[in-house]
């Protein structure tokens, strides 16, 4: 952590202690219950904040090995987060490109390929459409490269896998995380060693 910021936060906490309060505000304010219960506000926040900014989709330990995957709901969208054969974390909408059926129903597992339960279109865990029944007779003109899973921007940082579920946006992860990078790295969310005993 930046030393000046660290000292500022310590001084702020000591000031609260001296003032015998837990609050930085001069007066306590109450928000309308509607702010917490409104479906309209919820949908606006989900689309304008959570769908547009990086969100934690998984911890790295959840998809440690190639083929590991988890299914998540991020900002109201079902996604698959997986690790491909090269060890790269990837994220896709959990939707078959043929008829829009949900590809994965399990919460987690290990698969090199995802097969749609509806018409058996099959995708590599790197997103490419690799096979479909009756391709030559039913879809002779199909360009398989155009029917890969819809990929999401995905990045691995601070022990987490982050995704942006608005596929029309590009977020500069380096710039986005710059203000907290030093502190987040110092905490080390990737590895945690605890002095414990499992003896019973």
List each language-model region with its residue ranges.
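N-terminal pre-ligand scaffold of iron-sulfur
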Residues: 1-106, 152-155
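Rieske [2Fe-2S] iron-sulfur-binding domain
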Residues: 62-167, 171-181
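Core active-site phosphate/anionic-ligand binding loop and the adjoining beta-turn-alpha structural block
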Residues: 158, 185-192
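A contiguous, surface-exposed recognition patch within enzymatic or periplasmic domains that forms
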Residues: 182-187, 197
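Single conserved hydrophobic/aromatic residue that forms the stacking wall/gate
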Residues: 191-200
């Amino acid at each position: 952590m930046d030393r000046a910021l660290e000292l500022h936060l310590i001084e702020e906490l000591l000031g609260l202690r001296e003032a015998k309060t837990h609050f930085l505000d001069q007066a306590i304010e109450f928000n309308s219950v509607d702010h917490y219960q409104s479906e309209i506000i919820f949908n606006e926040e989900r689309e304008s904040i959570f769908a547009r900014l990086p969100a934690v989709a998984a911890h790295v330990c959840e998809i440690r090995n190639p083929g590991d995957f988890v299914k998540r709901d991020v900002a109201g969208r079902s996604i698959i987060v997986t690790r491909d054969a090269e060890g790269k974390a990837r994220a896709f909408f959990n939707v078959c490109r043929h008829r829009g059926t949900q590809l994965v129903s399990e919460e987690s597992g290990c698969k090199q390929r995802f097969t749609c339960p509806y018409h058996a279109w099959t995708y590599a865990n790197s997103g490419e459409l690799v096979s479909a029944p009756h391709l030559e007779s039913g879809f002779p003109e199909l360009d398989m490269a155009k029917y890969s899973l819809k990929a999401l921007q995905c990045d691995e940082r601070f022990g987490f896998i982050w995704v942006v579920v608005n596929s029309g946006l590009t977020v500069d992860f380096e710039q986005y995380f710059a203000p907290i990078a030093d502190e987040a790295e110092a905490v080390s969310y990737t590895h945690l060693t605890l002095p414990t005993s499992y003896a019973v």
